[in-house]
Structures are given as C-alpha cells and as structure tokens.
Amino acid sequence: MKSGRFIGVMSGTSLDGVDVVLAAIDETMVAQQASLTWPIPGHLKKGILDICQGQLLTLSQLGQLDTQLGRLFAQAVNALLAQQHLQPRDIVAIGCHGQTVWHEPTGDAPHTLQIGDNNHIVAHTGITVVGDFRRRDIALGGQGAPLVPAFHHALLGHPTEKRMVLNIGGIANLSLLFPRQAVRGYDTGPGNMLMDAWIWRQCAQPYDKDAAWAKEGKVILPLLQKMLSDPYFAASAPKSTGREYFNYGWLERHLAAFPGASACDVQATLAELTAVSISHQVLLNGGCERLMVCGGGSRNPLVMARLAALLPGIEVATTDKAGISGDDMEALAFAWLAWRTLAGLPGNLPSVTGASKASILGAIYPATPELRVN
C-alpha cells in the first residue's frame, strides 16, 4: 500500500487562490506538514468566471485556459517544495482536484468538467498526479459531489458523538457523521459565492473582510424569502450545485424586484441566506452535538455568529479546534483521495453521492515508469 508524503491541490468555487497542502499519509494517519495559498492571476480568474456563467468560449480559449491552469498548479506545487526544501522524489503523488467550470450531474447526459491539465503538472513538477476524481462517480449514477464527506468521516467521525462537518467555500456542503449510520452529505447551497460576487461588483473587493460591509446593512426579509423559495433548497439529497447555478445572474434575477435596495443591505441579506439555508438543513437532519466548520466562510464572523444563534444547543466551532486547519481541509482531502486511488481503495461514498457502488476514483498520470497501483 502506497504511503509517504502526498500533496493536495485545490482550487475551489470561491476562486480565492490555489490551496496546496503537504501531508504524510498511510492507512492509520493523515498528518499535515505544510501548506500555502498561491494567487490566481486576474485573467485566469476572469476566464473561469466567464465559463461558469455560461459565456461562450472557443475551443481554443478553453484549451489555453486548461494549459494555463495546469502550469499554475505546477508553480504552486513547486513553491511548496522549495519552501520545505523537498525534491520531487520525496513526494509519492499529487492529488489535484482541478478547477470546476461546469457541474451538471442530472439529465440524459450528466457531466462535470474540471480543467487544469494534469499532464502539465507532471511535466513541470516531475511528480505523479492523480486527478479527474469526480467523473467516475457520475458514470456510476452519482452526483460526483461532494467527495469530501468520506475524508471528514475518516478524520472527524466519532463512535458516540453526533457530528456534522460544514464546509463553507463558494458553495456550502454538509457531512452528516452519525454513529452507526451511513455517512451522508450534500451541497446546501451558496456559501461565500454570492457575497463575494456582490462585493466585487459593488466595491471591487474580492471578499467582505471580517463581514465589515455586511454588518453595516440590515437583512431585507422579502428578498431573503424570495431567494429561499428557489427549488434547490427544498430538493432532496443527494444533490450538488455550483457556480453554473448560483451565480451573479441568479442574484440579479432576484434583485429585479428590489430596485432601490441598499448595497450593504443586500450583502447582509446574502450572509443571512448562507446562514439560514445551512441551519435549515442541519435541523432538517435532526441537529447534532457539534457542528465543525471549515472553508473560507469559517472566517466570516457574521455567518458564524448567525449559525450559532440559529442552532441553539449545538456547539458551532471551526475544525481548527479539532486540530485540522479549516483553510486546508479540502486540499488535504484530495491528497488523501490520491492515496486511496494509489492504494486501490474506493474514494466515493454511495450514501453521499447516490452512485450505484463505491469505486476507485480518478485518473493516474505517472511521472515514472515504475509506478504501480497498490
């Protein structure tokens, strides 16, 4: 069974940077050793947003973006290696999620697309890459997401305590870790995505630091109720979503009925939307003893305070309290999924994604001819 140092690379729906994590992994432990966040240049961020919001691109433009992102991921990995004084031979493999640009897991031809060419990562790092984790699950009838609940269960599951793990990235997702029950999990709806999109359009800021702007505003209840009436929130799990659905266009359609709304009031309402939509799902599943929060949204004091207020009797705290950095959780998960793939172990949970069976996930891009699975 493969064990040793792995690197996880994650570029999520928030587009707040490429997260890169170094970890020692074997069948008994996942020990994070180092991490960094690598910036995404503005022109790449724009290209990603254009695709996600349905703008037309030529195949040439898509191919260029795929190559450029692959090179960017390689730069981020090489920066971490240099920081830690490591050589490619010191790393077993890189687990790279890629950048999701479209996710449509339902219909006659379900599909998901992550770009960032793994061949370029191998070529520029000299390290084996495991990538393309989601499409096998979709081929087996699953949603292809979320995949991280399996990792949450491995690291944070408890034999007697009823726990949930909440990741608030661009999209928020919930993992239900209940004793003696199959793990479940799904996307609850928007996390940071709409808040970030609004403050970018209104103030040219990438995010609302410390929720300072949202705190200036007041929640517009009719707008909140209108947004919460979206069918996604009432849909049954398994379910997953992304920027192709909850985007600036979605927000504009809801704002059309509120032409005089104050910009900071809209921001306050979007923060409340995130907190309320999450808390509804926590309570719908019977609540828990501990809600462990990770992702960029765990650093939003307003959202965290509202979750605590909406969920009395539940301990709401970041995963940092359990010794796992909330900022690095997803990148760490994909390092672990790479280890699972090379060990010949399944990476998905059918109870989460709805797939017909558990399966080894991903495609392997070997750096050396000596690589063997399991």
Swiss-Prot record:
Gene3D superfamilies: 3.30.420.40. InterPro entries: Anhydro_N_Ac-Mur_kinase, ATPase_NBD. Keywords: ATP-binding, Carbohydrate metabolism, Kinase, Nucleotide-binding, Transferase. CDD domains: ASKHA_NBD_ANMK. The keyword Metal-binding does not apply. ATP binds at G12, T13, S14, L15, D16, G17, V18, D19. It comes from the Bacteria. Signal peptide: none annotated. It catalyses: 1,6-anhydro-N-acetyl-beta-muramate + ATP + H2O = N-acetyl-D-muramate 6-phosphate + ADP + H(+). The keyword tRNA processing does not apply. GO terms for biological process: 1,6-anhydro-N-acetyl-beta-muramic acid catabolic process; amino sugar metabolic process; peptidoglycan turnover. One of its GO terms (molecular function) is ATP binding. Pathway: Amino-sugar metabolism; 1,6-anhydro-N-acetylmuramate degradation; Cell wall biogenesis; peptidoglycan recycling. Pfam families: AnmK. Its EC number is 2.7.1.170. Belongs to the anhydro-N-acetylmuramic acid kinase family. Catalyzes the specific phosphorylation of 1,6-anhydro-N-acetylmuramic acid (anhMurNAc) with the simultaneous cleavage of the 1,6-anhydro ring, generating MurNAc-6-P. Is required for the utilization of anhMurNAc either imported from the medium or derived from its own cell wall murein, and thus plays a role in cell wall recycling. NCBIfam families: PRK09585.1-1 (NF007138), PRK09585.1-3 (NF007139), PRK09585.3-2 (NF007148). This is Anhydro-N-acetylmuramic acid kinase. It comes from Salmonella arizonae (strain ATCC BAA-731 / CDC346-86 / RSK2980). The lineage of its organism: Bacteria, Pseudomonadati, Pseudomonadota, Gammaproteobacteria, Enterobacterales.
